[in-house]
């Protein structure tokens, strides 16, 4: 197919669909680094015009990465649902954008087509959309998953509680865990990024989280975010594992660099499901992704980083995960230079994931050497929450002391819930009310020093005596 567009007296020609996609992408440092970005704003607009006129069916006939060379491409093509695609098969990319923004694109209609939308189709239409378009369309996509609670219902935003510690110290983790629970965080998952890769340490962390969840009957799930093969070994040794985690990418070579294949993920999912630890559902997988991972592994095949990211969602979709999130600014300014680029990428990732039927959240974050700050994260958080993001990640004080990057704090997540009227997962919401942590109106309450959660976790891990304030030492939201 010939890809071209004329602006004024200049005719712009593009050699392939892959080139059109890359040049049409909003400016970002990773694509400049890869040498695939537009040379000018005019060229970028011409590529968008050419892309808008491209039939969606083209993506089924012209693979950006050859079928013979890449397992992810084979997965995308072989798993494509022609019946789900039929209602939109006659559309161009531009027509698809118009339909997504129309009243015809109801939640039911979007759910019906999700298995017919390939990652490249999702990425392509996102390149034609303003930020507000990404928000409007994503908000209409409803994706619900279940393990010990129900995640993704309308009007709700879950929070991953991330109690990391640089030495995996049990007392430090417990203090962060207590802090997060007192702010109403943790309904998405209580997930630790361990500093150690020792199997004994990993299993001990799993046991500690399981003990806390069981002792206080918390309707949530835990996860220790180590390599998938270590988690399989932990299951074999009888560890109380809830969710299997793995970082994934959008090309076979990227996943090879992570030490993972589809066969390994198949094995891990089967092992986790065999434990039957879910009480309201059996979505047992948790994935993380991020724009730039393919280029950092020299595995992008000349494809722009946002399209590579969307292709990772095809891998995730195979496993019907409980959770998936983009760690949007974590990889650094080499790939997303500043707050503007991070905000745009976060909205793109959320839209593409939701359009493809994934329960996608976001680690709203940045590294300390990026041209970004907490004001940018405030903006992205509010935009994503408005767009119906499934969950966000929160750490004490927004500063992850183990991974050394800046994320959201527990009170940031509480702020977003408060100003937009969002609630936690329903089972977790009831638990917060029953425990006296939250009121019927959702506001966080001040608790007494003898509160069973404060006293229990403090005694369990020999923490200092609680003083009656929320665990972070500041005044609890909703307190007089």
Q: Residue ranges of each PLM-predicted region?
A:
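Anaerobic metallocofactor- and corrinoid-dependent redox/one-carbon enzyme cores
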Residues: 2-174, 182, 189-467, 477
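Long, low-complexity, intrinsically disordered segments
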Residues: 471-480
